[in-house]
Amino acid sequence: MTDGERNTVFGEWIEAHKAILFKVARAYGTTHSDREDLFQEIALQVWHSVDAFRGDCAVTTWIYRVALNTALTWNRREGKHDRGRQDFEASTALLTAPAAHDPRLEWIYQRIAELDEVNRSLALLMLDGFSYRDMSQILGLSESNVGVKINRIKAALSAQLAKEEHDGL
């Protein structure tokens, strides 16, 4: 593939799937600056991965795989996972969708940020409607393990919501 062809494919992929990059950067970056850096790192890795895409899965699945692997590697390399979580309200400028200002969406993103790396990845994939099979392929887990983890995530989020509603938060 020539550089021109790679750039064309990359441009089409980014235009069609940039929301994935934003979501992953938002979920794994702890500050606005981190999220911007991570977004750029993910975009760079997507560009590098264009030649490796064989069409064995959907482009969306491929981009998610690249984005999540890049975020996990970046997080470990930068040591961001050891730092305290910061408030996500300062990051709304990163997302351009009007739904980003929905308090329910903000609540779910805050709770997702508190999850460990694998569960955070599963929660993002679940919100985007991926099947257990697709999630297992992206993350290298068995489908049954994905199902168990998703059920635990849902139960934990439901319990947290019930607690906050009970406490009047």
Regions from the PLM with identified roles:
Residues 1-23, 36, 47, 59:
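A short, charge-rich alpha-helical start-of-domain segment used by transcription regulators
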Residues 8, 77, 81-83, 89-113:
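Acidic, proline/glycine-rich intrinsically disordered inter-domain spacer in sigma factors
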Residues 37-44, 48, 57-69:
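Structural recognition of an alpha-helix C-terminal capping motif at a helix-to-coil junction
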Residues 42, 66, 122-123, 135-136, ...:
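Hydrophobic positions on the alpha-helical face of helix-turn-helix-like DNA-binding modules
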Residues 52-54, 65-86, 101:
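Arg/Lys-rich amphipathic alpha helix in sigma70-family domain 2
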Residues 68, 72, 139-164:
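DNA-recognition helix of helix-turn-helix
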